[in-house]
A protein has these predicted regions:
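Single conserved hydrophobic/aromatic residue that forms the stacking wall/gate
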Residues: 1-9
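Nucleotide phosphate-binding/pyrophosphate-handling subdomain across enzymes
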Residues: 10-118
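Thr-Gly-centered strand-to-loop micro-motif
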Residues: 65-66, 128, 154, 177
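Short amphipathic alpha-helical segments
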Residues: 77, 104-106, 132-133, 165, ...
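Alpha-helix C-cap/termination motif
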Residues: 84-85, 147, 167, 192
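Short glycine-rich anion-binding loops that position phosphate/pyrophosphate groups of nucleotides
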Residues: 96-99, 124-127, 179-182
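C-terminal helical cap/extension that packs against the catalytic core
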Residues: 110-170
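A glycine-rich beta-strand to alpha-helix segment
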Residues: 159-190
């Protein structure tokens, strides 16, 4: 039914999950009799959901994206989407979301974060919680290191900006990832 829409996958929105979403959209629109050229135009103009592999900007040929991912499966989808990009090294600046989630999914977070070349973890975004779980971002960094991958804990956003600006190179991709205030870092990197 959706013949003639094969080139619609040449979109700006990366990731196999977005291909699945596009296919669902095509199927639903086709079922409702929407013309193929309208479906194609809509999909080609779709730039993605806010804070889902969202382009923040670039400087010195270094590109910064922001993603709301705050669960290991979402971070894995982001890592897989990154494979569709051409880059020298990947940077993830991750802010865990809630103490309870970080504690219960510590091993899963550590494993998925090893998909990135450079890993920076900042303080847990507490949201509505108090830390009654005996967990910190340092525990996550240590777990990542136990898997044989280097990771860096940096609390201050300004220190993260300085660290990344001193080390990122042309053709690198930087991702700020998490449901909290980590989204501020990408813009701060651009402003320095």
């Amino acid at each position: 039914r959706s013949r003639g829409l094969g080139d619609v996958y040449k979109r700006q929105v990366p990731g196999i999950h977005n291909v699945s979403n596009a296919l669902a959209c095509i199927a639903l629109c086709s079922e409702y009799g929407i013309q193929k050229h309208i479906i194609k135009s809509a999909l080609l103009s779709f730039t993605g959901a806010n804070r889902r592999f969202e382009l923040v900007g670039s400087y010195e040929n270094i590109t910064i994206f922001d993603d709301y991912a705050h669960h290991p499966s979402e971070i894995l989808a982001t890592a897989k989407a990154l494979k569709n990009k051409t880059y020298r090294q990947s940077w993830i600046i991750f802010q865990p979301h809630t103490y309870s989630r970080t504690k219960s999914l510590l091993d899963d977070f550590a494993k998925v974060l090893t998909n990135f070349d450079n890993i920076i973890v900042t303080d847990i975004y507490a949201a509505r919680e108090s830390n009654n779980y005996d967990i910190s971002s340092i525990d996550l960094v240590n777990k990542i290191k136990s898997l044989g991958k280097d990771a860096t804990y940096i609390s201050s956003f300004d220190d993260i900006v300085k660290y990344v600006r001193e080390r990122a190179c042309p053709n690198d991709i930087i991702l700020t990832v998490g449901a909290g205030t980590v989204t501020e870092i990408g813009r701060k990197i651009l402003l320095k």
